[in-house]
Regions:
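Acidic, glycine-rich A-domain
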Residues: 267-404
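Extracellular/lumenal glycan-associated context and N-glycosylation machinery
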Residues: 1-64
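An amphipathic, basic-hydrophobic helix/alpha-beta surface used to engage anionic
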Residues: 45-294, 331, 335, 349
Length: 404
């Protein structure tokens, strides 16, 4: 029904144009004089243009989107140029062009607007450019460009939506961090990697779950009694620089800062060629196994570009599940914006497993810890668990605190 009404509306407007020409001609014939005939001859080209416009194949034009970069980092400017090429130079009085923006771009400040009016006339090729000052992190999809034209009085209008799909991945911001490789101390704390250590297979540095083939003498009876599971001692030669990084995807106003700091940590570790695995659990679980190098960095950054604050399970549950799957020595890094009882629970489980744990709390500015957070911080520090409160864009030397 709506289609029929729309078609009837367009037909009515199309018939109105020759009717106006006939009326002005009759008026000129009856009235006579210069003014009457001038009005008629003035209406003839306008009327003919309005009659021809609906038959012009604007859809045959070629529309392209050209951007200033192929890859972006959050906060960078986005500049796009929309170009239109026509095969037939039909005269166009005006042309309204609008590049339809992705949802996350609509609230961004624009130096030049994504909608413009051009007066191409007989030109076959023309373009316009718009700019967005800072773009947000994420995967953004452009779908189409709308082009609209019409006659002088707006009686006839023609609008075409061109499909111009483009997808851009905007990577998270990061800060250069000076990373120092860490090794597990005999009990708690850390040692710098450039310190020469004497390896002694008679010294136990941790415990892990029992695996077939382990010697009877390796069983740690105290840990076995404490956990009700058979636990095996880990010895000094098993020490490594392996890192496992967890990001807390709990909804928070500081989630973007958490992503930025996590990206900075990941980049610092992998640029030093240290092996690292990465765990991110929200509505879906994402796990990157232990690896190093640029390939691992690229994969994790791609994930961090898309990650959302959509956690449905406590972080402590994710930490517990992952630690049950690994047996080799590994340093755990937790990145969060809230030092909650759940983080304390995760730290307690890591301590039971004799895992080295680093907790980084991201805050906007100093003195923002709540009374509960201060209480948990004091409790963890008494247990010699490293907890560091870091502030936005002041991340450079966070690892030097660990080595003290």
């Amino acid at each position: 029904m709506k289609r029929m009404l729309r078609a009837l509306y367009h037909v009515t407007k199309l018939l109105l144009i020759p009717l106006c020409l006939v009326l002005t001609f009759v008026y000129a014939m009856l009235q006579g004089g210069f003014v009457s005939w001038f009005l008629f001859y003035s209406m003839v080209p306008i009327g003919l243009y309005s009659l021809l416009l609906p038959f012009y194949a604007l859809r045959n034009a070629e529309v392209k989107r050209i951007t200033n970069q192929d890859e972006y980092v959050a906060g960078e400017p986005f500049v796009s140029t929309i170009t239109i090429k026509r095969k037939f130079p039909f005269p166009l009085l005006y042309l309204v062009i609008e590049d339809e923006l992705p949802p996350h771009f609509t609230n961004c400040r624009q130096t030049k607007m994504n909608k413009a009016i051009l007066f191409p006339g007989l030109k076959r090729n023309f373009s316009f450019q718009y700019a967005i000052d800072t773009i947000p992190r994420g995967e953004h999809t452009f779908s189409s460009v709308r082009v609209k034209t019409g006659d002088l009085f707006g009686m006839m209008e023609k609008e075409v939506t061109f499909s111009v799909p483009d997808t851009f991945l905007v990577y998270p911001q990061y800060v250069d961090i000076t990373y120092q490789q860490l090794e597990n101390h005999f009990e708690q704390g850390a040692l710098s990697a450039n310190i020469n250590l004497v390896k002694d297979s008679t010294i136990s540095v941790g415990v892990r779950d029992y695996k077939p083939g382990d010697r009877f003498s390796w069983i740690d009876w105290k840990a076995t009694a404490r956990t009700n599971n058979i636990m095996t001692k880990e010895f000094e030669q098993q020490r490594s620089h392996n890192i496992m990084i967890f990001i807390d995807r709990t909804e928070s106003p500081l989630f973007e800062s958490v992503v930025t700091f996590t990206a900075s940590i990941v980049r610092a570790v992998l640029k030093q060629n240290s092996p690292a695995s990465f765990v991110s659990v929200g509505k879906e679980r994402t796990f990157f196994p232990l690896d190093n190098g640029d390939s691992q960095l690229q994969q994790i950054f791609c994930h961090l570009a898309k990650v959302q604050a959509d956690s449905v399970f406590p972080l402590s549950r994710s930490v517990e599940m992952e630690l049950r799957k690994i047996y080799e020595p590994v340093t755990i890094i937790l990145v969060t914006s809230d030092l909650s009882p759940d983080i304390q629970k995760a730290a307690d489980y890591a301590a039971i497993q004799n895992r080295k744990l680093l907790v980084f709390i991201v805050k906007e500015k100093p003195n923002q810890l709540s009374h509960q957070e201060l209480s948990i911080l004091e409790t963890l520090q008494k247990r010699k668990i490293f907890v560091n409160v870091v502030y936005e864009n002041r991340y450079t030397n966070v690892f030097f605190e660990v080595s003290k």
